[in-house]
């Protein structure tokens, strides 16, 4: 397995697909990286030469934020919003959807498991 940006990418897949295993790289960015490195997108990772792997590593490390750096930046951005207590920060603090989604009947995964309220009884008709 080739190691790029501290991630083992699979050998038996095409280069474009393998690069998407790196956090922060989608299919569009992977294709863009292949074009910059002048490597065919359809080439399998196991047939890449050492020189091609080195050029891929250099392009990814120097021009893109991936893996730990990207995760750290996202976490710091969320923390900053929480600290200044803007609307999105308050939604993060309350563990509610941030981008305007409905919460009346949905958002179970974001809100967590439903909690029973003590002392509240259902009325029988």
UniProtKB/Swiss-Prot annotation:
Subunit structure: Part of the 30S ribosomal subunit. Forms a loose heterodimer with protein S19. Forms two bridges to the 50S subunit in the 70S ribosome.
GO cellular component terms, A-Z: cytosol; small ribosomal subunit
Pfam families with a match to the protein in the record: Ribosomal_S13
GO molecular-function terms, A-Z: rRNA binding; structural constituent of ribosome; tRNA binding
Organism ancestry: Bacteria, Pseudomonadati, Pseudomonadota, Alphaproteobacteria, Rickettsiales
Keywords: Ribonucleoprotein, Ribosomal protein, RNA-binding, rRNA-binding, tRNA-binding
Protein name: Small ribosomal subunit protein uS13
UniProt family annotation: Belongs to the universal ribosomal protein uS13 family.
Keyword Ribonucleoprotein carried by entry: yes
Coiled-coil ranges per UniProt: none
HAMAP family from the UniProt entry: Ribosomal_uS13 (MF_01315)
């Amino acid at each position: 397995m080739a190691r790029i940006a501290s991630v083992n990418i699979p050998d038996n897949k095409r280069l474009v697909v393998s690069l998407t295993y790196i956090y922060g790289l989608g299919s569009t960015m992977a294709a863009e990286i292949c074009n910059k490195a002048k490597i065919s997108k359809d080439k399998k990772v196991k047939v890449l030469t050492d020189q091609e792997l080195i050029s891929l590593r250099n392009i990814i490390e120097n021009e893109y934020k991936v893996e730990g750096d990207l995760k750290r930046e996202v976490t710091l951005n969320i923390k900053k919003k929480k600290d200044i207590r803007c609307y999105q920060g308050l939604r993060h603090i309350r563990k509610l959807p941030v981008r305007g989604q409905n919460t009346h009947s949905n958002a179970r995964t974001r809100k967590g498991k439903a909690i029973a309220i003590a002392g509240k009884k259902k009325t029988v008709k």
